[in-house]
Amino acid sequence: MIFHKNWLGLIFLLLFLGIINVMRVPRDNSVKLKRTALEWSLATLTATLILWAAFDMEGQFQTINQTEWIVPPALNFKWGPLFLAVDGISLFFLILTALLTPICILISWNSIKFLLKEFLLCLLFLEVLLMGVFSALDLLLFYILFEGILIPMFLLIGVWGSREEKVRASYYFFFYTFVGSVFMLLGIFQLYSSVGTTDYQALLNIELPISTQKWIFAGFFLSLAVKIPQVPFHIWLPQAHVEAPVSGSVILAGILLKLGGYGFLRFTWPILPAATEYFAPFVIMLSVIAIIYGSLTTCRQVDLKRLIAYSSVAHMGLVTLGLFTHTIEGLVAAVFMMLAHGLVSSALFIAVTYLYERHHTRLIKYYRGITFSMPIFVSVFLVLTLTNMAIPLSCNFVAEFFSLLAAFEYNIVIGVLAATGMVWSAAYSLYLYNRVSFGASSNYLLFTRDLNRRELIAISPLVILIFILGVLPSLIIDPVKNAIMFSPGGA
């Protein structure tokens, strides 16, 4: 059945009620602050799961909320209606956002020592903005929310970052992504001046001249490529990950990196098809470079967080590779890879944080032989590293299989080059697990407590979903495929 059209509005209402209730809790009552934020984020997750359970997977937009823009009458222009809607693509990114937010609160339960109330409000505001980005059907609204995400993320890294370089890392993140976003704004202005609207559904029925499409695509590409991040626009990512608190790393790797791929799939292919097709060989070349460069650079890392960050560059290269082959397999693989990477990379950052909280170092050379002292952690870490190298029955295997299938269909040389990423992925994943888990116990590791109940509860949903999506990929593939086929930009 098709759920009530205002259900999406109810989800946003729950988000704002959560923010209001956290604001009402006294600053010195830290336990109540955390419980209130956790309860309301779980309520949002429940509402999002109900939306998924009642969603009609045929592919069309559902739960459409429409509101008029507030524009002063004296101005000589009028923007179209403000549309928020969900289809088979955006639905899963909403679920991923709703899932990772309470997990972020849980994993930060004991690590945030100051400005706890502001920290929780940052997380909840970030959830509102991300939910809005993934349901926006107006380009101007998408841009406003897209830009708004910079503020809470800047604060998360700069205020609650874990090391002395956190302020520099936050400025790196803000500068790169803000400058990139300016080009998108210029593209939106060019689009509006050409057709007089930024409404997504109206733009689907308008065919722009190829020359205009190319200029607009260039603006969108520079913005979205920074967010993915695509080589050579990735410089900000390792620094931001290393300095960010664990919740910042989870949000960054799990959701924010997906905004670029989502923007390409949602806007550039349907609205700028000719320009996207024209630039596809160039983007595919960059994607192959990202896969090889990201994988080789990952093998050289000595910091646990940097290793996972650079592996993300390689995996997101597979996303853009799938997107710009413009085949059903490639587009489905891109969405599946984004969701799988959101689960696996988030879980890996959480696992690394568990080690850091016990031993206060992220340098791989100090870790050795924790199998006997932390058997539960080692078991979870084994699942995550094997998934990261895309073993069968894992979600990464499904995503990489379809990505490489699309690559080989596009060009056999591209397919072979992209496939080398799987070899290097296995190399650094096995090295990481072997170095941390086996051998004689390191003299540097004095604190050996295994995972507690809270830590297990936080990471378990991600591990379970990794297997569920690996065994039952049709849960995502079918609705995503239907949504792509329904879209004018579908293959």
UniProtKB/Swiss-Prot annotation:
Core subunit of the mitochondrial membrane respiratory chain NADH dehydrogenase (Complex I) that is believed to belong to the minimal assembly required for catalysis. Complex I functions in the transfer of electrons from NADH to the respiratory chain. The immediate electron acceptor for the enzyme is believed to be ubiquinone. Pfam families: Proton_antipo_M. The keyword Transcription regulation does not apply. It catalyses: a ubiquinone + NADH + 5 H(+)(in) = a ubiquinol + NAD(+) + 4 H(+)(out). It is found in: Mitochondrion membrane. It comes from Metridium senile. Its main location: mitochondrion. Keywords: Electron transport, Membrane, Mitochondrion, NAD, Respiratory chain, Translocase, Transmembrane, Transmembrane helix, Transport, Ubiquinone. GO terms for molecular function: NADH dehydrogenase (ubiquinone) activity; ubiquinone binding. The keyword NAD applies. Belongs to the complex I subunit 4 family. InterPro entries: NADH_Q_OxRdtase_chainM/4, NADH_UbQ_OxRdtase, ND/Mrp_TM. The chain crosses the membrane at residues 2-22, 37-57, 89-109, 114-134, 139-159, 169-189, 215-235, 245-265, 271-291, 308-328, 332-352, 372-392, 412-432, 457-477. It is a multi-pass membrane protein. This is NADH-ubiquinone oxidoreductase chain 4. GO terms for cellular component: mitochondrial membrane. GO terms for biological process: ATP synthesis coupled electron transport; electron transport coupled proton transport. Its EC number is 7.1.1.2. The gene is ND4.
